Amino acid sequence: MKKLFKYLFAVLLISLSGKAQTNDDSSYDYVKAFKTDFYSNTSNNVRSASGKPGAQYWQNKADYLIDVRLDTLSDIISGKEIITYTNNSPDELDFLWLQLDQNAFKNDSKGSAVIPIRGSRAGTGGEKLDGGFKISAVQLISGKGSKKSVSNADYEVYGTRMKINLPKTLRANGGEIKIKIDFSFLSPYYGSDRMGIVETKNGKIYSIAQFHPRMCVYDDLNGWNTLPYIGQGEFYLEYGDFNINITAPSDHIVLCSGELLNPLETYTLDQLNRWAQADASDSTVMIRTPEEINDPSSRPDGKKTITWRYRMENTRDIAWASSSAFIVDAARINLPSGKSSRAISAYPIESYGNNAWERSTEYTKASVEHYSERWYEYPYSTAINIASSVAGIEYPAVSFCSYKSRGGRLWGVTDHEFGHNWFPMIVGSNERLYGWMDEGF
């Protein structure tokens, strides 16, 4: 009887289960459940269903002229910039949005409120500092020649964003305006594992990024993309041309995204000859040796500071590093078209030897050559790996990787970060919203 009861109970359960599964009144919609929210339009005049730009594709442009100065006594970076913003969209713009990512490191920022003091990659790692941008001037420049006018901007700051209300609508389809901003900030030692400072035997290494106000992206999907930066989530930026002047102490070597325009002013004659050797070599060539770090003759004579001038075209971002402690080496990168680029590594004496950073240029060269064959030819004149306080982060043509890494770990992080030059740096995806697109790839 007991067995019969168990049998009948099992039959009843199976019957009820079957009815539940065939219930036509279910509100579940599998199409809605699995529909993507990152590409809702399968095809239009701007974006085709194949992923290629449509016949009326547009994107706005932001060109930057930047002058910055590094004060190694205070760790303050001060500067000014002129942004030339071109509105290629079909929409007139009454206001502009900019990103102030350094504001994430203010004590009263949203990031400081929501990021754990310890145990998180984001934030300042518990460091308390008077961080964030100090904006001393924002001006609008319109017109050219005799019609040029300069006026103080009407702007508001909302956390890590700045809104500029325009006195006159910026016209669609090519309207242009210039924005001049004077700024400064105190660099954190640990800036969300994306920038920072590390102290070494022979001086501090400054790994500097998100160091100037940058335009938010205005696109056809979301209009202004103004999601705040709280330390987590990376970046979405307009493309443009960058010209930057970086003034640092004369015993420093400064490496930056792009092409160095004044090598004769920044390197010695011996070092210039070594650069020429590196450009013709598939093996690593020392530019500044470990023995030369504290040798005054390894730096140009006669000045307390040197201004390094760099230029990079058609990029969404730049980053730079500065230190008196750098050993520097380089080698040629061979590209599929027959052109070449330059692999460069800069690291302190603590990172030299025992299968460590003396192999970084070898790893950088191998990574860029591989991805150039596999995906798309590397478009930049240099690929620079900086030994840093940062565990691993990518910027166009520059990576910051831990100065403690060595062996397979150094190879892995170097290869990963330089792979990011294709995704998202060349592709230009929205990392703030869809970080999985480049990290997951």
What are these regions (language model features)?
Residues 81-83, 87, 100-102, 175-189, ...:
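Short, hydrophobic/aromatic-enriched beta-strand segments in well-ordered soluble domains
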